[in-house]
Amino acid sequence: MVKLTSIAAGVAAIAAGASAAATTTLSQSDERVNLVELGVYVSDIRAHLAEYYSF
């Protein structure tokens, strides 16, 4: 399982790279894209954990 620190590092790297090359398009299979998606999923699960357990 990917640690949240590596997700945060990936997001920070993308943010730093985005400011340097704002027009760069990443492919869907790029690891940085996958790390951001995973970070969003983890954040959503944490925010709605009680709702998930209620089902």
From Swiss-Prot:
- Entry keyword Signal: yes
| InterPro entries per the UniProt record, alphabetical | SRP1_TIP1, Yeast_SRP1/TIP1_CWP
Where does the UniProt annotation place the signal sequence?
A: 1-20
Task: Extract the Pfam families matched here.
Answer: SRP1_TIP1
Q: Which UniProt keywords apply?
A: Signal
Q: Taxonomically, which superkingdom?
A: Eukaryota
Q: Which family does it belong to?
A: Belongs to the SRP1/TIP1 family. Seripauperin subfamily.
User: Would you tell me the protein name for this molecule?
Assistant: Seripauperin-7
**Whose protein is this, by species?**
Saccharomyces cerevisiae (strain ATCC 204508 / S288c)
Lineage, broadest ranks: Eukaryota, Fungi, Dikarya, Ascomycota, Saccharomycotina
